[in-house]
Amino acid sequence: MAGGSRASSARISVSHPLIIRRRAEHDMAEAGLWYETRRPGTALYFIRCVDAAIALITRHPEAGPVQFGPFRRVLVSRFPFGVFYSIEAETVVVHGIYHSSRDPDKIRQLLESETDEPMA
């Protein structure tokens, strides 16, 4: 069709607002420090992988399966961690970043107790 235009079929990805709770920031810093003491430079790579997981959930909030009540989880690429979050209205709230070997009951307790803390 000469001179015509074709509509793009590409999907536009819209990011949802994001809140990262203090506990999640602490979890990421603590894990990054642990990795850095074992192999310099690894902390930055860990943080980039966590950031990629968070970017995914801001674009696709329902990407992670429900784990406990309102809490969902996406796995961090290349590291044995999960980002635990909830969707509150249109906002993605990251509550914690926990190692996959951690006791699921302990994670649930931490997530449930954290919901009463003020947001960062």
Regions found by a protein language model. Name each.
Residues 2-47, 120:
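Arg/Lys-rich, positively charged N-terminal/basic patches that mediate binding to nucleic acids
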Residues 3-13, 44, 82, 86-120:
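Enriched for short, Lys/Arg-rich terminal
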Residues 5-8, 52, 56-93, 97:
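Basic/aromatic recognition patch in beta-strand/loop cores that engages polyanionic ligands
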Residues 31, 60, 107-110:
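Residue-level signal for well-ordered alpha-helical positions
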Residues 39, 61-68, 102-105:
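Short, charge-rich, low-complexity interaction segments located
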